[in-house]
């Protein structure tokens, strides 16, 4: 279970700690394999739920950590990571709103800040060697703290399964709520919760009802729709049903409203950064409503070329966030450019929630480029349809010349 040569160079390490099976095993493993190394547990509160934090400090100390730092990042996470990313229109492979991916840079940044505060010379994470998160965390560490050593136990130890980890903890009399029967790997934050593993590893299996934990089954959702109104300023949701709210509070309220209607469920097979495909089920109720509202206002206020540019930026931004490249010059540039475009994304939207769907049914904006007078199919006084003839001749000129040359 250990590495061959015990390390004596690392004096103090900050571990990204959740209290789950993996990180519970990492603390004693570090003590056994890194001589005289002090272990500082760090937990980022990104809205995963109070139940995940209860007793966490005591558990970390009982496992062998000397300190446990729980840092409240909820408001910062929504304000400085979720809102700016959504303003770019980022959505990975057409469906994934990047709930897990967006959380990694803020967690890594806070972990580095704790390391600097306590004078640590190493950072440690519990990401597996098959997943995206190892790249995301270590990419952020490289950008923020290239001088600190990174320890990745899953790439060092010989344990290969949940059963191995459970046996390892049992041998050391370390208690854990994990068990071999808990088959799903879950990751939660204020924006979403992800589910992987178990029967989901076979794409021919429909997800069982036990997979989903945050949203109602659309089949069991209310038979009557619910309407929710959102006010948007500069591409940010500022009010929900007329109530002015902070970014985090707005997201929480939308989660509570949308989840009972089964909104925000997706079941996707995505291309991981490390080359393999993986299947995940994601629940993003409030974020799905926000995304629908922002897109609705963009339809009103962005001209054709601006909207095309925003879609291109959104696609590029989705890959940057998914691939762990938040702290890069390109990401910074795309965020800044999107802020300029978001200055016109203002207005109100009413979203209809019904059995898994979130549909924008009303929208208005003081910056709207839509004119009923110009768009009407009835008799109008502001648009001379004869003007279209000259435009069409110029627009199709290249095609006309090509056809004439071909004769």
Swiss-Prot record:
It is found in: Cytoplasm. The keyword Amino-acid biosynthesis applies. GO terms for biological process: argininosuccinate metabolic process; L-arginine biosynthetic process; urea cycle. NCBIfam families: argG, PRK00509.1. Its main location: cytoplasm. Its EC number is 6.3.4.5. Gene3D superfamilies: Argininosuccinate synthetase, chain A, domain 2 (3.90.1260.10), HUPs (3.40.50.620), Single helix bin (1.20.5.470). InterPro entries: Arginosuc_syn_C (IPR048268), Arginosuc_syn_N (IPR048267), Arginosuc_synth (IPR001518), Arginosuc_synth_CS (IPR018223), Arginosuc_synth_type_1_subfam (IPR023434), AS_cat/multimer_dom_body (IPR024074), Rossmann-like_a/b/a_fold (IPR014729). It is an enzyme of class 6 (ligase). L-aspartate binds at residues 128, 132-133. L-citrulline binds at residues 96, 101, 132, 136, 185, 194, 270, 282. ATP binds at residues 16-24, 44, 126. GO terms for cellular component: cytoplasm. Signal peptide: none annotated. This is Argininosuccinate synthase. It holds the Pfam family Arginosuc_syn_C. GO terms for molecular function: argininosuccinate synthase activity; ATP binding. It catalyses: L-citrulline + L-aspartate + ATP = 2-(N(omega)-L-arginino)succinate + AMP + diphosphate + H(+). It comes from Shewanella sp. (strain W3-18-1).
């Amino acid at each position: 279970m250990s590495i061959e040569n015990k390390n004596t160079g690392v004096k103090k390490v900050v571990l990204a700690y959740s209290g789950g099976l993996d990180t519970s095993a990492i603390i004693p493993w570090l003590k056994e394999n890194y001589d005289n190394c002090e272990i500082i547990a760090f937990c980022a509160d990104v809205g995963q739920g109070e139940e995940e934090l209860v007793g966490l400090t005591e558990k970390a100390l009982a496992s062998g950590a000397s300190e446990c730092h729980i840092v409240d990042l909820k408001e910062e996470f929504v304000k400085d990571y979720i809102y700016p990313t959504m303003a770019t229109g980022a959505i990975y492979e057409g469906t994934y709103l990047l709930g897990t991916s967006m959380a990694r840079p803020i967690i890594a940044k806070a972990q580095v800040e704790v390391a600097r505060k306590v004078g640590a010379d190493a950072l440690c994470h519990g990401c597996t060697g098959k997943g995206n998160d190892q790249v995301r965390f270590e990419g952020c560490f490289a950008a923020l703290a290239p001088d600190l050593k990174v320890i990745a136990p899953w790439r060092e130890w010989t344990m290969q399964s949940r059963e191995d980890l459970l046996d390892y903890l049992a041998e050391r009399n370390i208690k854990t709520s994990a068990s071999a029967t808990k088959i799903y790997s879950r990751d939660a934050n204020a924006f979403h919760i992800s589910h992987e593993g178990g029967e989901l590893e076979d794409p021919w299996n429909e997800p069982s009802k036990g997979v989903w934990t945050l949203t109602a089954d659309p089949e069991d959702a209310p038979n009557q729709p619910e309407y929710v109104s959102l006010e948007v300023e500069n591409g940010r949701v500022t009010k929900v049903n007329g109530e002015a709210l902070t970014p985090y509070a707005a997201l929480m309220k939308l989660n509570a409203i949308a989840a009972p209607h089964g909104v925000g469920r997706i079941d996707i097979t995505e291309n991981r950064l490390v080359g393999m495909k993986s299947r995940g089920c994601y629940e993003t109720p409030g974020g799905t409503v926000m995304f629908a509202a922002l897109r609705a206002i963009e339809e009103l206020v962005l001209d054709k070329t601006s909207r095309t540019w925003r879609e291109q930026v959104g696609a590029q931004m989705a890959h940057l966030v998914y691939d762990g490249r938040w702290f890069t010059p390109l990401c910074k540039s795309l965020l800044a450019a999107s802020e300029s475009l978001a200055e016109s994304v203002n207005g109100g939207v009413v979203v209809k929630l019904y059995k898994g769907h979130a549909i924008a049914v009303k929208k208005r904006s003081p910056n709207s480029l839509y004119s009923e007078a110009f768009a009407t199919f009835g008799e109008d006084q502001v648009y001379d349809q004869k003007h279209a003839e000259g435009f069409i001749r110029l627009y199709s000129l290249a095609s006309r010349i090509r056809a004439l040359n071909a004769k």
